[in-house]
Design a protein with these regions (language model features):
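Long, terminal "pre-/pro-" and other extracytoplasmic accessory regions
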Residues: 1-130
Length: 130
């Protein structure tokens, strides 16, 4: 067994099916730089990094936890509509979402200007941090 936080290289075809489907649906045109499996006390987690520095993290069941892009917006199809509406409205003109994280309780996005906005599960803004 691995100690908490122990990583080992893996390949995309060894990820859970849901993770593989997510990657092929949203990032099939990108080139994978590497993939790692991390053994934690709560189970395995996975991270895939592409050559353009896009990073995607998955839970053990293959559901995505985090998508981050260095120079491009995250796929609009993974951003819940209330968050898209909040960001694309008159609040933040010219900004795009370059990172999105989710867990059981909150969603958090980082805009291209570095601003971080946290939402609860009902998509109410609960924190804005620059």
């Amino acid at each position: 067994a691995y100690a908490d936080g122990r990583e080992k290289p893996t390949s995309v075809d060894k990820l859970p099916q849901a993770a593989q489907e997510f990657l092929s649906a949203h990032f099939k045109d990108l080139t994978v730089a590497y993939a790692v499996e991390e053994q934690k006390y709560t189970g395995k987690e996975y991270e895939v990094v592409y050559t353009d520095r896009t990073e995607v993290e998955f839970r053990s069941d293959g559901q995505w936890e985090s998508v981050g892009r260095k120079y491009s917006p995250v796929p609009a199809s993974i951003v819940p509509q209330p968050i898209q509406t909040f960001v694309s409205g008159s609040n933040y003109p010219g900004q795009f979402i370059r990172q999105i994280d989710r867990n059981a309780y909150t969603w958090e996005v980082e805009l291209s200007n570095g601003l971080e906005i946290k939402f609860d599960n009902q998509f109410n803004v609960i924190d804005i941090d620059d």
